[in-house]
C-alpha cells in the first residue's frame, strides 16, 4: 500500500490500524538541535484523543506516546524520529457481524475492490486513529515553526448549520478550548452543543467547517506551478478523512466577485509591504504574501450512524440492510482541529526548509 508518506524535505510516514496493536509515525528531515520530549508531543495528542466529551466517541484511549528514536539528551539529532502509541481500548466485537456488509459512507467497499482484503475492525487503516501519527509529527513541526515566530490555530466555524461570528486570531486562541466543540464564538458554541445532543438522540451525525489560520509566515514561501503553497495545503487538508472540500482565503465566494472586489490592494506600513485586505488568504501565485494563511475545510457528517441503511452482502451478493453499532463520534470537526493544525504545520515547515529559511540539517546553523 503506497501513499502513506507525505512531504518533501520534511517527510512523515504514518503506520498502524484502528484495532491493531499500535499506531505511529516516522519523521525524516527533522533538523538537529530542536529541544523535544514526550511532553511536547503528548500535549497535542491529548487534544485529539477520544472519550473526552459528549461530542466525541466514548472509546477510552490514553494515547500515551513513546519516542523510539531521533532524540539524544533532549534534542533532535537529525536522524529519523520514530513515535508510537499503543491501542489499549480496541473492541472489535461490534464489527464482526458486519464484516461482509460495506458501511455506507465508509471506505470499506473501495478498499475491498482495490486490495481484495481489508481489516474490518474499525475501518483499519482508513480509521481516524491514523491521525495519531499526523498529530505527533505536527507537534514537532509546530515546535520548529514557533522558533521562527509562526503560529497556527484551527477552530470550528460551523457545525450542523450553526455558524460562528468572525473573530481575531488572539480571541480564537483564548476561547478555543473553553468549549467541547472548539468554537471561539461561545454563543454559537452553545447552539452547536445542542445540535450535537439532538443528533445523538436521533441516532444521527452532523458535519461542519474547520478553519485553519497561520500567522508569521514570511512572504515568498512556496514553489510556483505544481508545488504551490496553496496546492500543498489543499492536498494536506483534503487527505484528512471526512474532508470533502477545501477553500483558501475567500474561497468559493471569489466566483461571484468582481476583480476590484477580489484584489487585495498593497500599502506600505512601518516600512513593510502589506495587503489592506486578505481575500487571497495569504497566498498569490502559490507563494506566501506575508499575510495570514487562511484555509477552510468542509467536513461531512460521521458516516457511522445507528440507523437502518441499505448495503450489499458481499459474501452472498444480495441486497441487505445494516445498523452500525459501537462507539462513534456524533460529529467530526471538533476532534479534527488538532489534526488540521498538524497538517498545516507539516506543509509550512516543509516549505520553510525548501526555501532556505530553515537549515535542512541543523537548527544550530541558523
Swiss-Prot record:
It catalyses: 5-O-(1-carboxyvinyl)-3-phosphoshikimate = chorismate + phosphate. It comes from the Archaea. Its EC number is 4.2.3.5. Pathway: Metabolic intermediate biosynthesis; chorismate biosynthesis; chorismate from D-erythrose 4-phosphate and phosphoenolpyruvate: step 7/7. GO terms for molecular function: chorismate synthase activity; FMN binding. Its cofactor is FMNH2. PROSITE patterns: CHORISMATE_SYNTHASE_1, CHORISMATE_SYNTHASE_2, CHORISMATE_SYNTHASE_3. Reduced FMN (FMNH(2)). GO terms for cellular component: cytosol. FMN binds at residues 125-127, 285, 300-304, 327. Gene3D superfamilies: Chorismate synthase AroC. GO terms for biological process: amino acid biosynthetic process; aromatic amino acid family biosynthetic process; chorismate biosynthetic process. The keyword Lipid metabolism does not apply. InterPro entries: Chorismate_synth (IPR000453), Chorismate_synth_AroC_sf (IPR035904), Chorismate_synthase_CS (IPR020541). SUPFAM superfamilies: Chorismate synthase, AroC. NADP(+) binds at residue 48. It is an enzyme of class 4 (lyase). The keyword Lyase applies. Keywords: Amino-acid biosynthesis, Aromatic amino acid biosynthesis, FAD, Flavoprotein, FMN, Lyase, NADP. Belongs to the chorismate synthase family. This reaction introduces a second double bond into the aromatic ring system. This is Chorismate synthase. The gene is aroC.
Amino acid at each position: 500500500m503506497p501513499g502513506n508518506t507525505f512531504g518533501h524535505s520534511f517527510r512523515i510516514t504514518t503506520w498502524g490500524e484502528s484495532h491493531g496493536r499500535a499506531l505511529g509515525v516516522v519523521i525524516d528531515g527533522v533538523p538537529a538541535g530542536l529541544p523535544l520530549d514526550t511532553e511536547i508531543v503528548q500535549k497535542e495528542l491529548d487534544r485529539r484523543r477520544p472519550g473526552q466529551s459528549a461530542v466525541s466517541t466514548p472509546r477510552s484511549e490514553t494515547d500515551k506516546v513513546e519516542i523510539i528514536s531521533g532524540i539524544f539528551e533532549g534534542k533532535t539529532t537529525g536522524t529519523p524520529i520514530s513515535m508510537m502509541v499503543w491501542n489499549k481500548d480496541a473492541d472489535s466485537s461490534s464489527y464482526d457481524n458486519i464484516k461482509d456488509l460495506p458501511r455506507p459512507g465508509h471506505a470499506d467497499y473501495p478498499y475491498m475492490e482495490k486490495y481484495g482484503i481489508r481489516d474490518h475492525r474499525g475501518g483499519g487503516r482508513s480509521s481516524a486513529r491514523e491521525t495519531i501519527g499526523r498529530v505527533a509529527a505536527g507537534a514537532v513541526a509546530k515546535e520548529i515553526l514557533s522558533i521562527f515566530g509562526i503560529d497556527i490555530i484551527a477552530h470550528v466555524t460551523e457545525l450542523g448549520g450553526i455558524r460562528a461570528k468572525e473573530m481575531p486570531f488572539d480571541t480564537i486562541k483564548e476561547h478555543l478550548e473553553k468549549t467541547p466543540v472548539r468554537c471561539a464564538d461561545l454563543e454559537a458554541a452553545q447552539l452547536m452543543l445542542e445540535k450535537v445532543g439532538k443528533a445523538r438522540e436521533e441516532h444521527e451525525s452532523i458535519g461542519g467547517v474547520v478553519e485553519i489560520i497561520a500567522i508569521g509566515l514570511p512572504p515568498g514561501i512556496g514553489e510556483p506551478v505544481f508545488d504551490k503553497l496553496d496546492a500543498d495545503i489543499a492536498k494536506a487538508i483534503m487527505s484528512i478523512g471526512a474532508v470533502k472540500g477545501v477553500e483558501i482565503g475567500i474561497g468559493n465566494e471569489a466566483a461571484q466577485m468582481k476583480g476590484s472586489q477580489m484584489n487585495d490592494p498593497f500599502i506600505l506600513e512601518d516600512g513593510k509591504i502589506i495587503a489592506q485586505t486578505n481575500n487571497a488568504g495569504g497566498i498569490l501565485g502559490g507563494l506566501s504574501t506575508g499575510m495570514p494563511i487562511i484555509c477552510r475545510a468542509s467536513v461531512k457528517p460521521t458516516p457511522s450512524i445507528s440507523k437502518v441503511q441499505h448495503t450489499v452482502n458481499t459474501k452472498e451478493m444480495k441486497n441487505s440492510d445494516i445498523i452500525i453499532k459501537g462507539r462513534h463520534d456524533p460529529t467530526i470537526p471538533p476532534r479534527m482541529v488538532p489534526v488540521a493544525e498538524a497538517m498545516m504545520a507539516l506543509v509550512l515547515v516543509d516549505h520553510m526548509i525548501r526555501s532556505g529559511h530553515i537549515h535542512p540539517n541543523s537548527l544550530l546553523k541558523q
